[in-house]
Design a protein with these regions (language model features):
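Short beta-strand or tight-loop elements
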Residues: 14-19, 64
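Glycine-rich beta-strand-centered segment in the early N-terminal region that forms part
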Residues: 22-39, 49-92
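Short N-terminal binding/cap micro-motifs at the start of the first secondary-structure element
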Residues: 12-16, 42-43
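Short polar catalytic/cofactor-binding loops
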Residues: 8-12, 38
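Short structural boundary motif marking the start of a folded domain
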Residues: 1-5
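Conserved catalytic-core motifs of eukaryotic protein kinase domains, centered on the activation segment
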Residues: 45-47
Length: 98
């Protein structure tokens, strides 16, 4: 099972925990990415500290890159094995797969 950094409460860096998270098959219009790189952005500190609060528990991070592992129905122009990157919400990019 893939792992991700998750927070269950706002606070200092110590509230971030490395946990296993279920990742299902992509739904229509979605892809599954085996992430190899994540971007660190100051908004992640805002989410973690509570300046921009999230519902808990929640993943953090807004950008990542990796290889496409699976493609949902209706996706065009992206195939399994393609290298991709994104910088968009919802938060949760601090993860091995998404």
């Amino acid at each position: 099972m893939p792992r991700a950094i998750q927070i269950k409460k706002q606070g200092a860096a110590g509230v971030m925990k490395w946990v296993e998270v279920p990742v299902g098959k992509p739904k229509r219009g979605q892809i599954l990415i085996n992430q190899s790189h994540v971007g660190l952005n100051y908004i992640d500190v805002y989410h973690r500290s509570g300046l921009y609060p999230l519902e808990m528990p929640h993943g953090i991070g807004m950008e990542a890159a990796g290889n496409v592992e699976a493609v949902g129905a209706g996706v065009k122009g992206i195939r399994v094995g393609d290298r991709v990157a994104y910088a968009a919400g919802p938060p949760g990019s601090y993860a091995e797969a998404r």
